[in-house]
Every structure is written in structure tokens, then in C-alpha cells.
Amino acid sequence: MNQERILQVLRAPHVSEKATVQADQNNTFVFKVAKDASKLEIKKAVEALFEVKVEAVRTANMKGKSKFFGRVAGKRVDWKKAYVSLAEGQDIDFLGAE
């Protein structure tokens, strides 16, 4: 996998209350990923970018919410979420604090 595709696969870390609990208790991190990304691509991208060992990847397709923009009804875009489980002793530090 080339460097350009690695950067396209992982969009951003997904920060939520559930994601924080998963990271603390299960050593599982949540990412927003490209809709066409496979589990193998996600695994390789995380291992290359963060230099960690990935044990498992689970994905979920999230449907965009219906919203009103003024009086006009609209819909947010659909997106894909990946739960990445790391090997024991591995960690990802998003903040870079030491």
C-alpha cells in the first residue's frame, strides 16, 4: 500500500464517550475511515502510521442523520467507523503529551 492511500484510508480519530471507554478498558481505538476502505487496508494504515501491532479490526457503516437547515430538510453524509484493537502493551497517543 502506498503512502497516499494510507493517508486516504484514515480520516480522523473518532472522539466520543464510548470511544474513550473502549480505549481505556479494551485497548480499542475508533477511527473515521474512507467508505471504500477494507479491514486489511485499515490494519496496514494504522500499523504504518502509528507503528503499533493491530490484533483486530471491526467496521460499521454509519447512516447520516436527517437535519433541518432553516426550513429545508437535508441529510448529513454517510460515513464508516473502524474499531481497531491493539496488541497487549501497545498504545496510540493522539495528543502527543509525554
Curated annotation (Swiss-Prot):
Give the molecular function GO annotations: rRNA binding; structural constituent of ribosome
GO cellular component terms, semicolon-separated = ribonucleoprotein complex; ribosome
In terms of Pfam families, this protein maps to: Ribosomal_L23 (PF00276)
Q: Which domain of life is it from?
A: Bacteria
InterPro entries given for it? Nucleotide-bd_a/b_plait_sf, Ribosomal_uL23-like, Ribosomal_uL23/eL15/eS24_sf
GO process annotations (BP)? translation
Q: Which UniProt keywords apply?
A: Ribonucleoprotein, Ribosomal protein, RNA-binding, rRNA-binding
Q: What does this protein do?
A: One of the early assembly proteins it binds 23S rRNA. One of the proteins that surrounds the polypeptide exit tunnel on the outside of the ribosome. Forms the main docking site for trigger factor binding to the ribosome.
Stored PANTHER family:
60S RIBOSOMAL PROTEIN L23A
Q: Which family does it belong to?
A: Belongs to the universal ribosomal protein uL23 family.
Q: How does it assemble?
A: Part of the 50S ribosomal subunit. Contacts protein L29, and trigger factor when it is bound to the ribosome.
What is this protein identified as?
A: Large ribosomal subunit protein uL23
Task: Identify the coding gene.
Answer: rplW
